[in-house]
Amino acid sequence: MITVSNTVENLERLSDEGVSIWLDDLSRKRITSGNLAELIAHKHVVGVTTNPSIFQAAIGSGEGYEEQLADLAVRGVTVDEAVRMMTTADVRAAADILRPVYDATGGRDGRVSIEVDPRLAHDTEATIAEAKQLAWLVDRPNVMIKIPATKAGLPAITEVIGLGISVNVTLIFSLERYREVMDAYLAGLERAQAAGIDLAGIHSVASFFVSRVDSEIDKRLAKAGTDDAQALKGKAALANARLAYEAYEEVFAGERWTALAPAGAHKQRPLWASTGVKDPAYKDTLYVDELVAPGTVNTMPEGTLNATADHGDIHGDTVTGGYAQARADLAAVERLGISYDEVVKQLEDEAVAKFEVAWGDLLEAVATSLRGKGADGE
């Protein structure tokens, strides 16, 4: 059941600390029931993120999509076309609901993100083409196109930003890759500036994934079985994210940035993603309470949003004072024989594969629905 709690003091405090609250979920029901509008009005939600898994769950349920599916079946569209028409319709509707936020914040918030086809994660040119098509299909100024931070995704980010399209860079797990993402963004801004595009119209976030880092490293710490290993559980993800913020501060105080800022460029904000706690031993608001820093975004599932409203512990900046401890924690993990580079590479590969599976499941579900309504579903 979709509900809106009246406990919002913690969410107001989080917003006041400079953290933009985005909802990591979207469905036709959430739009048509008025729930999304309620969350914006009463729970400080100022943006929405989607991904293939979210759309697979929403459209796979069928709820709210029957009429559009019937229309698409009559028109004889392909499965891929049907999926894109349904997902972009949801994103367009959400963008319209969030448009007042977009206008009030000068484009900083009020954003809705939609991801390129995950099957293209290792194809630069196809990703660029898909990003341009999605921006055209949604046709709203407050859409952000999600491009994965794979090696092939990096030049696509530069190209798409260079065209003046706002981008949410997703699936970032490592500090090295995050620096490459920021470099790709700055290169895109430089390209846009050279082409005479107004930099003030370009916004970007870099989605740094959090809880999955703990899930994998904690599993390896448990295998180590020592007291030292046990003491490090639940620390790696926060350490990783805090050091990412340190890198953000460094890059956006550097010469490349200071050359772009006078032209109206916006910093690429860090976005904390995968902030739902997966280990029941941890407080369910851990990745919200402990990642409060100015100029960030935290996109959270509704359960985490409600938990933060109810019993979150928002008490100022919990990031910038922790860089030395963060480095110490990651170094301690390495000393136990757990390779940081190996973990983050595995997480990236698994995340891309997971979204490919979800997209395949979505295509299959839509094909079945189209066939059931008289289309061939090819």
Swiss-Prot record:
Reaction catalysed by this enzyme: D-sedoheptulose 7-phosphate + D-glyceraldehyde 3-phosphate = D-erythrose 4-phosphate + beta-D-fructose 6-phosphate
CDD domains noted in UniProt: Transaldolase_like
Signal peptide start and end residues: none
Keyword Amino-acid biosynthesis: no
EC number: 2.2.1.2
Catalytic residues of the enzyme: 146 (schiff-base intermediate with substrate)
Residue stretches spanning the membrane: none
Function description: Transaldolase is important for the balance of metabolites in the pentose-phosphate pathway.
Name used for this protein in its record: Transaldolase 1
Organism of this sequence: Streptomyces avermitilis (strain ATCC 31267 / DSM 46492 / JCM 5070 / NBRC 14893 / NCIMB 12804 / NRRL 8165 / MA-4680)
